[in-house]
Design a protein with these regions (language model features):
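Bacterial N-terminal signal peptides
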Residues: 8-17
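Compositionally biased regions
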Residues: 8-9, 22, 46
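Solvent-exposed, well-ordered loop and adjacent helix/strand elements within mature globular domains
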Residues: 25-138
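Bacterial Sec-dependent signal peptides at the C-terminal "C-region" and cleavage site
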Residues: 17-26
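Positively charged n-region of N-terminal signal peptides that target proteins for export
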Residues: 1-5
Length: 138
């Protein structure tokens, strides 16, 4: 129960920030909030959860997310990693419009096997990243 509360608090804390404008022009990096999850067994795409999978808005499913650090001055830093967009989710509804933060494309939610790794991710990124979406199939 405590782990679930901590996970929820991490998400809520991020949603209190002003929304970053996220436009998903494929191939162009853009700013996003990031969260992390460690629960569940099967993704929205039907594959088992595993390291290297992220949850995004449904329209981005099947794409690949190349994630870069968000530097303190707001500029884009080094590449952090590559994730497959194979899951989706709702995320918190910060503005009350009935559309969650993941669903709206404001947040990318990374899967990690443990709560500790989720916390490490949040500490490493500060909850903000740059994301480049590419169609890397084939």
């Amino acid at each position: 129960m405590v782990k679930r509360v901590i996970s929820c608090l991490l998400v809520i804390g991020l949603l209190l920030f002003a929304a970053l404008s996220a436009k998903a022009d494929e191939g162009e990096p853009f700013k996003m909030y990031t969260t992390a999850y460690h629960h569940g067994e099967i993704t929205a795409s039907g594959v088992p959860v595993r390291r290297g999978i992220c949850a995004v808005k449904r329209e981005w499913m099947g794409l690949t997310a190349i994630v870069y650090e968000y530097k303190p001055d707001g500029s884009m830093g080094d590449m952090i990693g590559i994730w497959e967009c194979l899951d989706t989710g709702f995320g918190g509804d910060a503005d009350g419009d009935g559309v969650g933060s993941i669903e709206s494309g404001k947040v990318i939610d990374m899967y990690f096997p443990t709560l500790e790794e989720c916390r490490d991710w949040m500490e490493q990124t500060g909850g903000k990243v740059y994301v480049q979406l590419v169609d890397a199939e084939g």
